[in-house]
């Protein structure tokens, strides 16, 4: 509490180790917000599928999604919007106002060890439409979406948590594929930059 009063902290990210139970989480987020001298962004990684800190915690009886890819397979953005609405509703209930989702990557590299089914599609247009709809669903519940991982993690062969991920695409190639979901008319307010090197661009 003293730290939040003393320093102008702007945001908090809750990881799995911080999440024990529904009542604990709701209380913790409220205490953080109440203690802070500055209104906080309180965020979590809740993509649905493999990355879902709340839904994948057995202490929470929340809807679970197989993956973004499973949702994207329908080709109907309304399915992604419904996913965003569902996730947004329960994040709001537990005191979150920001989600580090949706994943806006285009899953073009079958050897990618970290994105895979976290992406809505291997088709850029489909990924863009789905990510935009999911983001809108989150916003409808007052949750700030964060499209990730700019400039595109889908065509890398490395897990950026353990090594430097590299895309060898040119700026033109990125613009025609990976960047499309980030340039779509999403009304987005936040983008997460990936730990990705682009030697043919920079």
Residue ranges with predicted function:
Residues 37-40, 96-97, 141-144, 184-190:
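Short, well-ordered coil/turn segments that N-cap beta-strands
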Residues 167-175:
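Extracellular glycoside hydrolase catalytic/binding regions
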Residues 124-154, 175:
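Loop-centered beta-sheet repeat module
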Residues 150, 176-202:
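Flexible, glycine-rich surface segments
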Residues 6-127, 155-168, 194-202:
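Enzymes and membrane/adaptor proteins characterized by extended Gly/Ser/Thr/Asp/Glu-rich
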Residues 82-86, 129, 133, 176-181:
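A non-catalytic, amphipathic alpha-helix used as a structural packing/dimerization or gating element
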Residues 12, 45, 91, 134, ...:
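Conserved, mostly hydrophobic/aromatic
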Residues 1, 5:
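Mature N-terminal segment immediately following signal peptide/propeptide cleavage
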